[in-house]
Amino acid sequence: LQPRRTEAMQADLLIHADWVLPVDASDSTLASHSLAVADGHIAALLPRAQAEAQIDAAKTLELPGHALMPGLVNAHTHSPMSLLRGLADDLPLMTWLHEHIWPAEGRWVDQEFVADGTRLALLEMLRGGITCFNDMYFHAEVTGRVCAEAGMRVLAGMIVVDFPTRYADNADEYLRRGLELHEHYRDHPLVRPAFAPHSTYAVSEEPLARVRTLADELEVQVHIHLHETRDEVQQVLRAHGERPIARLDRLGLLGPQLVAVHMTQLEGDEIARLAETGTQVVHCPESNMKLASGFCPVQDLLAAGVNVALGTDGAASNNDLNLFGEMRTAALLAKGVAGSANAVPAAQALRLATWNGAKALGLEDAIGSLEVGKAADIVAVDLGDPHTQPLYHPCSQLVYAASSHQVRHVWIRGREVLRDGAPLTLDPPTIIEAARQWGARIAEA
């Protein structure tokens, strides 16, 4: 009798790489493995010999010297603010906001600004291996449209503030526009709406309570700046007799749906309460240092069981959208703040920028790791550069030595959006020219 031949698995794409870092439960580094993609999802992750024997792929890609990793998740940014990069630097947060950023936004922000700024941000993020980001800005419907066209995954933040802008006159109008955004994108595979009340000092109690009710009804995340600076905490304490976290807790907003950004001013009981409620925290180390806002106690949060993700913040306060840089800075800063060399080791830093980010955005079942059944959001990094050689530990090199320019290929939901470092869904010359024109207009004003 002849042995029964096993029918080959059909796949759209089979990638052979020297290393795969799936960001699984054991933080594995898999040598000489292959990853198969079918219908936009990961169909198999196998040793190369098994993959060659068992998988029949429409296309095969050889990536010697490369590591495959999950797409990076930028858990907090303001993508259109890429057009304000370098407008005002070396200033504390409130001076930066009140005297420079908010006046510029009041004059310039419209749908064209948001579209051009978002495209510039997408170009930078895709080239740096970011496949999903959590955005907070005006005209989120435009950001959603641009991301859908480019094949980028986004949580489009439906912003809420008390004061009038060119976008809306009051909190009611912000919420109405947010609900329209949700209705438009509620079933979109890449664009997912979220509420984005700016902060506890820019949004009063009634709109915050409405955000909580609507977020519960619609099952969406709530994205907010929280405990960013000492002055913010003191301002809210004087105005309301309680610290911002306590205020949100009283309003019922703490919980897994809340994405709390910055969190540099935390006391022990607040960390315990964040852990108890399952509240998500986003650490933006480079922006916080540049604005002298303080240090997020990442090691204490992680030790307490709080999920911590990484964000770049906007390009106006960072001044780049480079999560490779944020991983390295987060790992180094955590060691200095905790006084411990093993605080946030390389594998944990990579997790902050991938799986933890996905969890913060409520997407951990779909993205954040390279596992069978998840969406094929994949990044290939060339580790052949001088500063990532020799290669003893791929994860350490990715976190402590690699640069965003080493990202060579990117797929989102199985669609190739970056090939050999060149974007396939964006037009760089047009985007850069639009940015130059905006820069000239703003500088001359």
Where are the regions a protein language model picked out?
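Active-site glycine- and acidic-residue-rich loops that bind
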Residues: N134-Y137, A194-R210, M289-L291, A360-G362
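Alpha-helical scaffold segments that flank or form the walls of functional sites
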Residues: R85-G151, Y174-D187, R436-E444
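Metal-coordinating catalytic core of metallo-dependent amide/deamination hydrolases
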Residues: V142-T264
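Histidine-centered divalent metal-coordination motifs
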Residues: L72-P80, H223-H225, H262, D313
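His/Asp/Glu-enriched, well-ordered alpha-helical/loop segment
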Residues: R250-Q257, Q299-D385, A401-A402
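Active-site gating loops and adjacent loop-to-helix segments of metal-dependent hydrolytic enzymes
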Residues: L83-D116, R153-D172, R230-Q257, T277-Q280, ...
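Active-site microenvironment of metallo-dependent hydrolases
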Residues: L1-H33, V37-A43, R48, Q54, ...
